[in-house]
Amino acid sequence: CFAGCAVMNMDRYSGDGLFASYPMGKRASSKHISFTLPEMTADFINAYVTGSLGITGHFIGACATSLYNLNAGVELIKSGKSELVIVGAAEAILGPPAYIGFSAMGAMATDERMTNLQQLLGEGDDLDYTKFCRPFGDNMGMVCGESAGFAILMSDRLALEVGANIRGCFLNVNINADGNKKSISGPGAGNYFSVGKTFKDIETVFGAKTLQEKSCFLAHGTGTPLNRITESHIVSTFAKEFGIENLPVTSVKSKLGHTMGTAGMDQIWCGLGALESQKLTGICTIPKLADDVFKENLDFFLENKEFNSQKDIAFLNSKGFGGNNATSALISSNLTEKLLQRRFTEKELKAWKKKREATLQLREKNFELAVNSDIEPIYEFDKDVLDLTDLEISKKSIKTKTGFDYALNSDLTKSDF
């Protein structure tokens, strides 16, 4: 499992509660540190959900954290070291420390700023908090949100063997730093590299026609004046270079706010929904694009609407403070199945679809249980805890009382060195 957060968890059960306890004359809880540390999102999944003894970790990449963890999972599967990886993020960021910090950076859409903007635009004096986050429109800053999201990645072999409901795939995640900077929080050149490389990945695997006709773009779209200029220029530039005439563009932050480390997972769910329903969520908080937004070869969706043609690729873009740029592309189940046809026989794919029927039935059943609050969350507290007496250790393997047989095989050979 690779999961965590971008900053830290800051609610009263974690960082805020820990730091406020002493000044307020209260005692810190033994859980405060555990809930504060970024990598504990993965640790709690390993300890209380999956019972995993496998590879784990967390990559912090500011606002690109989710895509950093996605990259770790994708590369682990491509290397053959794992066949199933859970990737994701969870961040409790809403609280005074976050607002104070981001406001000091000039990044927040504060009441004062939005009052001035609304008066300037003739929108009246009554603040409309539902329209505080305005990506690519006349805006004054971002809005903090909270979210949690996880995805299960599998090798194609394992997915077919277990009859998985394959909703799409990722080919690659491209990550680039900004190089030399003046302001550490300011944007740089790195996102040009990550976006351009991802466009090239799609063109290489699926061809120019598919890239040009079947793509949409889920922008980072924070709602800051600088982001609307820099990111729109990046997307417009590569849309022109790769011959895309009207690339659909949106930002889910207009509805969810900026969930920090989890922002990339928000984009994944938005992308999945868009490719499955052929409808894209719009930037519904702005009446029009700002004058300084680059629009050439782009089609910004300012309302929820259907695509005018079949889309099978959703680009996901993250621009994080410090120069943490990550871009990937979510491939639809339709194109994913075509990729599987290149690797597996018709008989193997038919067997997978047969197994998938049971998976879909179970999925529908569990969905109904969840909607009706009739399903309990998995919380394996103090179950199958292993100590020294539960391990059978030899030079060749480590066996546990729970049935796990871990072969001590090295990934290295002498020829590597």
Where would I find each of the regions flagged by the language model?
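Active-site-proximal alpha-helical scaffold in enzymes
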Residues: 38, 42, 46-49, 57-91, ...
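Conserved catalytic cysteine-centered active-site region
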Residues: 8-22, 26-72, 105-143, 234-266
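Acyl-CoA/ACP chain-elongation machinery
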Residues: 81-143, 173-188, 219-228, 245-298
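Conserved beta-ketoacyl condensing-enzyme motif
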Residues: 1-59, 84, 90-101, 203-233, ...
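Glycine-rich phosphate/pyrophosphate-binding beta-alpha loops
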Residues: 62, 182, 256-261, 318-324
